[in-house]
Amino acid sequence: MVHATSPLLLLLLLSLALVAPGLSARKCSLTGKWTNDLGSNMTIGAVNSRGEFTGTYITAVTATSNEIKESPLHGTQNTINKRTQPTFGFTVNWKFSESTTVFTGQCFIDRNGKEVLKTMWLLRSSVNDIGDDWKATRVGINIFTRLRTQKE
C-alpha cells in the first residue's frame, strides 16, 4: 500500500534537515562587547590559540565612594576540546579600589540563538587585619549578554 505524503510536510522536513545542523554548530565567542544584568560593561579582545585574552571592564556598581574607572581584565578560555560553548575565567584588577574580582563561567547559545555568558564571581577586598578576613570576600553571579551596536 502506498501512502500519499503532503508536499507541505516534505518541505517542512527538508527545511529542518537543512537548518538544524547549523544551529547546533554555532560557536559562542567571548570576543566582543558585553553588558550584564546590573549594567556593567566589558570588552573582551581576541582569544589567542592558547585560549588567552585581555580586555576592559567598567562596573556599574561599587561599595566604595571612589570614582569608578575602567579596569583591565585578563583571562583564559578552555581550548582542550574546542567546544562550541566554552568555559572560561578572568580576573579584573580594579583601578579605583584595593580589590580584585575573579569570574568563572560558560559561554552559551540560548534557545533563541543569542550568546549568553553565565558567570559566578568572587570579589576580594583588602582589609587591614586578619581578624577582618571573614568580611573581605563576596560572591555573586552575573549574566552577560552581547552589547549590540545601533547598527545591529
Curated annotation (Swiss-Prot):
Keyword Cytoplasm set for record: no
First and last residue of the signal peptide: 1-24
Annotated localization: Secreted
Residue stretches making up the Avidin-like domain: 26-149
Cross-referenced PROSITE patterns: AVIDIN_1 (PS00577), AVIDIN_2 (PS51326)
Protein residues bound to biotin: 57
Top-rank lineage group of the source organism: Eukaryota
Gene Ontology MF terms in the entry: biotin binding
Post-translational events: N-linked glycan at Asn-41 consists of GlcNAc(beta1-2)Man(alpha1-3)[GlcNAc(beta1-4)][Man(alpha1-?)Man(alpha1-6)] Man(beta1-4)GlcNAc(beta1-4)GlcNAc.
InterPro entries linked to this entry: Avidin (IPR005469), Avidin-like_CS (IPR017889), Avidin-like_sf (IPR036896), Avidin/str (IPR005468), Avidin/Streptavidin-rel (IPR051764)
Biological process per Gene Ontology, one example term: antibacterial humoral response
Glycosylation sites: 41
Disulfide bridges in this chain: 28-107
Expressed in which tissues: Synthesized in hen oviduct and concentrated in egg white (where it represents 0.05% of the total protein).
Keyword check for Secreted: yes
One of the record's GO cellular component terms: extracellular region
Keywords from the UniProt entry: Biotin, Disulfide bond, Glycoprotein, Secreted, Signal
Protein family: Belongs to the avidin/streptavidin family.
Assembly and oligomerization: Homotetramer.
Function: The biological function of avidin is not known. Forms a strong non-covalent specific complex with biotin (one molecule of biotin per subunit of avidin).
Protein name: Avidin
Organism encoding this protein: Gallus gallus (Chicken)
